[in-house]
Design a protein with these regions (language model features):
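Substrate-binding/catalytic cleft of secreted carbohydrate-active enzymes
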Residues: 211, 339-342, 349-538, 542, ...
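Beta-strand-rich binding/interaction modules
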Residues: 121-123, 209-244, 251, 273-275, ...
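Beta-strand/loop-rich accessory regions of lumenal/periplasmic or secreted enzymes
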Residues: 114, 159-161, 264, 626-629, ...
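Extended carbohydrate-recognition surfaces in non-catalytic/accessory domains of CAZymes
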Residues: 20-111, 163-176, 180-183, 534-535, ...
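Active-site-adjacent substrate/metal-binding segments within catalytic domains
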Residues: 66-99, 103-123, 129-132, 190-203, ...
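Substrate-binding clefts and catalytic carboxylate motifs of secreted carbohydrate-active enzymes
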Residues: 33-53, 57-59, 63-66, 88, ...
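Accessory beta-strand-rich segments of carbohydrate-active enzymes
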Residues: 22-23, 44-46, 88-197, 219-221, ...
Length: 949
């Protein structure tokens, strides 16, 4: 056996060495590979910053990010091809490079991966070809006869930021994204043998059928093409050799692989195809290797999209190629980061909005597993037909062999030229579906930003519903807010296959002319699930939970839990037994424990997933019973590649809070009265109650004042006008202006009296009210100085925010620590994505769209057992004993433009109702059942325990 193993290893090594010695395509980079290794070229900018002089610039780059020219956001000049005032500087580049003598006699192409926008190229003073127009596409020139071999050569490039072609400007530059200028993707020499394989287009089906069209630059008598299929270990599986027809420019070949490992987003199995062009003596003239995957795409009318015979659900997002410091110029590492970011949210699809991405991004999608919609530019304007024909050919020739690409997109939102629809399949032997985003075409209805109710109507149409943009993000709105309702509707409907959220990340530019300020152009670029540097916002985790392919259906467990969970396997292909599950039984610290008290892990284990096939439900048995002293069970699902899908937390014991142990001689609470106040003292603490309104007016600990006061007060609010929904006020001309403003209900309660009585060792202070919302606030003060507040208020009607509140000066707050859902705040329509655990964060108050500190300190927090707020004056501790109540920590801040909400000040609050949040396009009530206001009728009660330290 050892001899066989050694022989196989030797043969594999020999094959590898032989492949290395084949005449293959070489690359000599003239620029860097991306933003991380730019190469300096000489540069002259004609206008704007640092213009009018020769200097240096890194290539590839967007010149604005290197300190040149003028920043320009595209939508400013929407619909105008040649407007006055548009930034239209040009950049002139020079670069000297050596070409080795060994390249003589070979074909040398000068390749630009992309340049914005019109690009003219000279080598050694001679123009090498026609001006290129179209910013996001690879283009090249055969410069074989322009070069000096073994000597230095001069490359000169002139790039115009604005195109001379009106259709290019309208398609690419009058759009809702940043316009840049420059050679923003790599430049290299592509060196091939004089007789070579020019291009290869592969079609590999799920049944193992492999077809390829091989294009050669020359077809001589006796030439042939040998094709070998290699598995992921480099082992040859099969091969074939076919003759090349003399005088033809392409050759078709076919072979078969038995039982191939199929490519899907869940199983991204890749193969290699090695193509060798042979002369009539069998000598290899040129060899090319392509990665590919076996998979079959099928669109079934009025049914769905099938990959390898399985109907898939699209869990997707739109993605720009972008970073704040480098604009559209990325690197291999940053492209992989983007794919991992999406996979981390359990997404399986991405739309390349609104242009083709870097090749490295597609390679990452191939190897890590994402379904891709590859898009021709055209935001609202469209390319003229000759330009579009040329760009489509280049786009598909570059991208055709990526198994991750499932759809081609002909522009965006009527930015499609219908004369181009037939061009895609001319170059794609796989005949992938062609999409019109926001349109109805090729069996797909892709309408954008429909409300929840409108989406239901679209699903009644015969076409497959797949919105290529939905739940438009803005600051903390959209994305995860409303996603639960949308997704439950979408995944269950027989004619909906999912869709693409807008958008992955904020497009905020780091302005080198504004001391590094991140410029999102107000609300235009602030649409991301994550911030410009991929700072994770609350919706990131909502999406991660809701789109997890493994769903635990239990909502709670108790002490009698037997270890069995109901589970749904929402994978399209994988069995649940390919996943692992880690569990822990834990004990949480109490509110009264030290601030650094940690969670105790009492017991932990791991189980393999049970045998539950894709698209089905079953039982997951983790084979453990709950320990008597356990507070909660953590359960984490791990996918076959070692990535966490989600962690569920199941509390089994809402904590019985311990009070300070006092000796029998401990002093009972005592009180004193004046005309206006009642002061209660217990355990070095003093509490002042007003006799005019019954509210707590002041707290001190050991004569140290804590300005927690003015409560409880009833707070209730609703959106001032329910514009665009069922409450729209047609008689109010300013109704639309009010649909984001929340107005408080005035509480007409009249204070009647303050009662004081002793109850055992405690003192009970009761404030009574009539004729309004607040009915009663009963304070029980025990000898340790704890206050238990039992309150009752009444409300009847529609409400978006409701509960009780207290005041505390925000500028005194340092941090908070709590046991509850976290670490992010929640909205009524974005409850998912948090986990019950101990969390803490320092005070922050980021301005949405401008500063990016997460999780936000302020907002509404769910399922809180206790919360300790550390201040400059001391600690305010709340233990919540009101079922289903939320703790409010001030009110969330909106962006400067107040496009989402203007919420009333709510201080420190205990809330029975919290507001939902809208998205950029749809008003709040249009986002689904979870976004509706609450109808409340009758008394509401609650209990909360306060400790001051």
């Amino acid at each position: 056996m050892k001899k066989v193993t050694t022989l196989l290893s030797t043969l594999a090594l020999a094959t590898t060495l032989a492949a290395q010695n084949l005449p293959q395509t070489e690359r000599q980079y003239l620029s860097g590979h991306g933003c991380d290794d730019m190469v300096e070229w000489d540069f002259f900018c004609t206008d704007g910053r640092n213009s009018g002089k020769w200097t240096k610039i890194g290539v590839p780059s967007c010149w604005e990010l290197q300190g040149f020219g003028t920043y320009q956001y595209g939508i400013t000049f929407y619909g105008k091809p040649f407007p006055k005032g548009v930034a239209d500087e040009k950049g002139m580049y020079k670069y000297e490079f050596e070409v080795p003598e060994k390249f003589r006699g070979k074909q040398v192409n000068l390749v630009f991966e992309a340049s914005m926008t019109d690009t003219e190229v000279k080598v050694n003073g001679r123009k090498v070809g026609s001006k290129h127009q179209g910013a996001f596409y690879r283009f090249s020139y055969n410069v074989t006869d322009f070069l000096k071999y073994g000597k230095k050569n001069l490359l000169e490039v002139t790039v115009a930021k604005e195109s001379e072609n009106a259709s290019v400007n309208l398609a690419e530059r009058r759009a809702d994204y940043w316009n840049f200028g420059g050679i923003f993707r790599p430049v290299f020499l592509e060196v091939k043998p004089a007789v070579n394989l020019r291009h290869i287009a592969i079609d590999a089906k799920m049944d193992g059928t492999f077809r390829a069209n091989c294009y050669t630059n020359i077809s001589n008598d006796g030439m042939s093409i040998r094709t070998q299929i290699l598995d992921k270990k480099g082992k040859k599986i099969t091969e074939t050799t076919v003759p090349v027809k003399a005088g033809g420019d392409w050759t078709s070949l076919q072979l078969n692989v038995s039982n191939p490992a199929l490519w899907t987003a869940e199983t991204p199995n890749l193969y290699k195809a090695q193509f060798s062009l042979l002369d009539k003596a069998g000598k290899v003239l040129h060899s090319e290797t392509e990665n590919f995957g076996f998979r079959t795409i099928e669109v079934r009318e009025s049914d769905g999209l099938y990959i390898n015979g399985v109907r898939i659900n699209v869990r997707g997002v739109n993605r720009h190629s972008f970073r704040p410091e480098s604009g559209r110029t990325l690197s291999k590492e940053k492209n992989i980061e983007d794919v991992l970011l999406m996979k981390g949210m359990n997404m399986n699809s991405v739309r390349l909005s609104h242009y083709p991405a870097d090749p490295e991004f597609l390679e990452a999608c191939d190897s890590l597993g994402l379904y891709v919609m590859d898009e021709l530019g055209g935001w609202h304007g469209k390319y003229d037909t000759p330009t579009g024909v040329r760009l489509i050919e280049g786009m598909i020739e570059r991208d055709v062999n990526h198994p991750s690409i499932i759809w081609w997109s002909n522009g965006n939102e009527k930015g499609w030229n219908t004369e181009l629809d037939g061009e895609f399949h001319k170059y794609d032997p796989q005949k992938r579906p062609v999409i019109h985003p926001q349109g109805n075409f090729s069996g797909f209805e892709t309408m954008h930003y429909r409300s929840y109710g409108e989406s239901q109507n679209y699903m009644r149409l015969p076409e497959i519903f797949m919105p290529t943009e939905f739940l438009h993000g803005l600051y903390d709105g959209g994305h995860g807010a409303g996603l639960y309702d949308y997704w439950e509707m979408m995944r269950k409907h027989p004619r909906c296959i999912g869709g693409f959220l807008w958008v992955l990340a904020d497009e905020g530019v780091k302005r080198v002319d504004m001391d590094g300020f991140i410029d999102n152009q107000g609300n235009f670029g602030a649409d991301g699930i994550v911030g410009p540097h991929h700072e994770k916002e609350g919706s990131y985790y909502t999406i991660k939970q809701l789109w997890s392919p493994v769903q635990i259906m239990n909502t709670s467990i108790d002490k009698q839990f037997d270890g069995k969970f109901s589970v749904e396997n929402r994978y399209d292909y994988l069995n649940l037994n390919t996943c692992r599950f880690l569990w822990k039984q834990v004990k949480f610290p109490l509110a009264t424990d030290a601030s650094n008290a940690a969670i105790q892990v009492l017991k932990e284990g791991e189980v393999q997933g049970s045998d539950v096939v894709a698209h089905s439900a079953g039982i997951l048995d983790i084979k453990t019973n709950i320990l008597p002293n356990a507070d909660a069970l953590f359960l984490t699902a791990i996918d076959p590649y070692g990535h966490e899908l989600w962690r569920w937390t199941f509390p089994v014991n809402k904590l019985n809070q311990q009070t300070e142990q006092l000796s029998p001689l401990s002093s009972r609470p005592a009180y004193t009265e004046t005309e206006n106040e009642l002061t209660v003292k217990a355990n070095k603490r003093a509490f002042i109650f007003s006799k005019k309104d019954g509210q707590l007016k002041g707290v001190s600990v050991d004569n140290r004042k804590i300005n927690f006061a003015n409560g409880p007060r009833f707070i209730g609010a609703r959106r001032a006008d329910r514009s665009l929904d069922q409450f729209y006020n047609h008689d109010d001309e300013k109704a639309k202006e009010k649909d984001r403003t929340y107005s408080e209900f005035p509480d007409a309660a009249v204070f009647t009296k303050l009662d004081v009585k002793e109850d055992g060792g405690n003192l009970v202070v009761t404030a009574n009210y009539k004729l309004g919302n607040l009915d009663k606030a009963q304070w029980t003060i025990n000898p340790s100085g704890e206050l238990a507040l039992d309150y009752t208020y009444n409300f009847s009607g529609v409400v978006d925010l409701m509960g009780i509140r207290f005041d505390y000066p925000e500028d005194q707050v340092i941090s908070k620590r709590w046991l509850g859902a976290g670490p992010y705040r929640v909205w009524q329509n974005r409850i998912h994505g948090t986990q019950y655990d101990v969390w803490e964060n320092d005070y922050n108050d980021p301005i949405p769209g401008e500063t990016f500190t997460y999780p936000e300190f302020k907002g509404y927090f769910g399922d809180v057992s206790w919360m300790n707020i550390q201040t400059k004056e001391g600690t305010i501790s709340l233990t919540n004993e009101t079922p289903d109540a939320y703790i409010g920590v001030y009110q969330p801040r909106d962006g400067r433009d107040r496009l989402l909400y203007t919420l009333p000040e709510s201080g420190i609050s205990v809330l029975n109702v919290i507001p939902p949040v809208r998205n950029k396009v749809n008003s709040t009530d249009l986002c689904g059942p979870s976004s509706q206001p609450k109808w409340v009728n009758g008394p509401q009660t609650g209990r909360v325990i306060f400790r001051f330290m």
